C-alpha cells in the first residue's frame, strides 16, 4: 500500500497537475481532483473537507490564471477559489502535509510568503499555449525529498489507525517480542524446545471482512498450533508454526484490533447503506496503510522487536 497524494488545481492548471501525478506515480498513489473518486453530487469543497481522512498529502497548483491590480500595479495571480481551497486543506492537514506548487509569475498573497513553495517556469509553445518547462520536474525532485523524509520520519496525523497501531504495539507486539527474545534459546512450548523464535504480523487483505474470522481461517489454513505465553503483564494466546528439526518457532498474529478502524470509518461517513462507496474504500486503504507504517516505525525503534518481529502480507 502506497502513501496517497491529492492534487488540486484550476481547470487551466490541469496539465501541470497531470505532470505532477506522473512524476510521483511510481512511488505514491496520486489522485487528481478530476479523477472519478468522489460522488457526483458532492462539491469540491466537501471533497476537501474529507480529504484529511482519505489522503496523506495534498498539493495545490497555483497557476497564473487571472489578472490582479494592486495599488495600480498589474499582476498575474491564481484563481481565488484555488487559494481558498488550499487554505481549507492546510487547516485540515497542517503545514507538513499541504504544499503549494506555483507558477513563477503567479503573485502569492503576502500572508503566504512564509509557506514553503515549489516554483516552476512557463513558456509559450509553437501553438501559442503556455506550458510548464522542465523546471517543474526539477522543483518536484526537491519536493519529493521532503515528502520522502516526512514519510520516513513518520509525521503522524491524529487518525484512528495511529492510536490503534500504538495500542496494538504496546499491548501485544512489544511484550511478545520481549518474551521471545528473553526466553530463547531453550524456549519450551507444547513440550518442544526452540533455539530461535520470530513474530510475524499478518496484515489482513482488507477491512471488508470479519477480521477475527479471517484470522481463524488463516491459522487453520496454515496448520498453526495454539498455545499460551506468559509475559510480564498478562497471558496471551498465540498461534505458531514449529520447525522442530531446526529448533525454529514462528509465531503468527493477525491484528484483529483493526476492526475498530472499520467502525470508526462507518461512523465518520454516517453509513446507512449496504456495501462500500469509493470514499469509504479510500479511507479504509488509507487507514490500513497508516496502521502498517506506524507499526513499522514503532518496531524499528525497539531493540527486541528489531530482532524478531516482521510485518507480512497474507499468503494464499
UniProtKB/Swiss-Prot annotation:
Alphabetical keyword list: Antiviral defense, Hydrolase, Nucleotide-binding
Cystine pairs: none
Function: Effector protein of a CBASS antiviral system with NAD(+) hydrolase activity. CBASS (cyclic oligonucleotide-based antiphage signaling system) provides immunity against bacteriophage. The CD-NTase protein synthesizes cyclic nucleotides in response to infection; these serve as specific second messenger signals. The signals activate a diverse range of effectors, leading to bacterial cell death and thus abortive phage infection. A type I-D(GG) CBASS system.
Enzyme Commission (EC) number: 3.2.2.5
GO biological process: defense response to virus
Coiled-coil intervals: none
rRNA-binding recorded as keyword: no
Residue ranges of every copy of the TIR domain listed in the record: 4-121
Protein name: CD-NTase-associated protein 12
Source organism phylogeny: Bacteria, Bacillati, Bacillota, Clostridia, Lachnospirales
